[in-house]
Amino acid sequence: MKRDYPDRPIVGVGAVVVDGERALVVRRATEPLKGEWSIPGGMLELGEKLREGIVREVREETGLDVEVFDVLDVFDSIFPDREGRTQYHYVLIDFLCRPMGGELQASSDVSEAKWVTAEEAGSLQMKAATVGVIRKALGLTGQMCPSSVPRN
């Protein structure tokens, strides 16, 4: 399915990867949001389950392996073009995750990857909803529990 001017919304997943008091952020190298900071994530592939998509996207973009916990947020991300047509429309499901291995390095469709505190996230060029979900995740880190999303 093409990303721009889709026939229907595209399902995407995001990972709020938390390590202590910091969360992982990436700088997007492709549209939409090229040059902006975000959390690792992307589109699900056909036949791919949610948690598989999260693990794959984080590994592709950052080189890290993650354990997936619960859903943090679900929201629409709609980008109209100059004529008012819907150029991009995503339904995004963000999950709380923690790093389990690998070596942090930007790759795939990101130009940078780094760890930030909640305060630092607020000072980056980043959508307010992303800053909010990072702050929510950092407030929940003491309550991490295995994902209620089925593993099969």
Please report, for each region that a protein language model flagged, where it lies by residue.
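NUDIX/MutT-family hydrolases
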Residues: 94, 105-137
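Active-site-adjacent beta-strand/loop module that shapes the phosphate/pyrophosphate-binding cleft
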Residues: 76-103
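A short coil-to-beta-strand element that immediately follows conserved catalytic motifs
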Residues: 65-74
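Charged phosphate-binding loop/patch that engages nucleotide di/tri-phosphates or the phosphate backbone
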Residues: 131-152
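Acidic, metal-coordinating catalytic segment for phosphate/diphosphate chemistry
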Residues: 1-14, 85
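Conserved Nudix-box catalytic region and its N-terminal flanking loop in Nudix hydrolases
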Residues: 22-60
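A structural signal for short, well-ordered beta-strand segments
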Residues: 15, 71, 95-97
